[in-house]
Amino acid sequence: MFGTFMRYLLRRQPLNALLVLPLLPVIGIALLIKGRAARWPMSLLLWGCTFGHSEARLMQLQQDFALWFREHVIAFPVVQERLTTYLNANDADIWLITGSPQPLVEQVYFDTPWLPRVNLIATQIGRAYGGWVLTLRCLGHEKVVQLEKKIGTPLRLYSGYSDSKQDNPLLYFCQHRWRVTPSGELQQLE
């Protein structure tokens, strides 16, 4: 969702592309060196997409994006069924740990029956230097760090579901690991 949001911002604010384009080589090299989960290169990209716009304008764009995204998001029945099963069990703590910014997650899924019943850990954004930046990039090993801050160590998790190999550091601590395929099917991981 985060990448889609930044593309959405650039489509709505095409002049920011003039700022983003010269930043892309720096961002690309930094991601190659530091890895895809690095915070500052993506923070620089977000800043380039949002620089020069008021907080009110950016909040409106965020809200507009959430409405647009809700119309295009595809629900995966198998994944929803598993989530519902865990929610109905009443003996599990359920965590949604996502690389998407928390305000986007909350706005896109605000009316779902499950959002109020899960614990959310997400990427955080804040205002700095005339735009938005990432104050926390919740991706890769950072997901482990953030969950350990909430529930302590050592992590012992029953099951984990992910659509990305970036989540393998967190899935390592799960007894049962599942990869969500692009078509919404579940593949059990070893």
Role assignments for model-derived ranges:
Residues M1-K34:
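Active-site neighborhood of HAD-like aspartate-dependent phosphohydrolases
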Residues A56-Q63, L67-E190:
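C-terminal cap/substrate-recognition subdomain and adjoining C-terminal extension
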Residues I29-I33, P41-G52:
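Helix-loop "lid/cap" segments that line or gate small-molecule binding pockets
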Residues R36-M42, P116, L120:
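N-terminal short leaders/motifs
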Residues T4-F5, M42-L45, D64:
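A general alpha-helix detector
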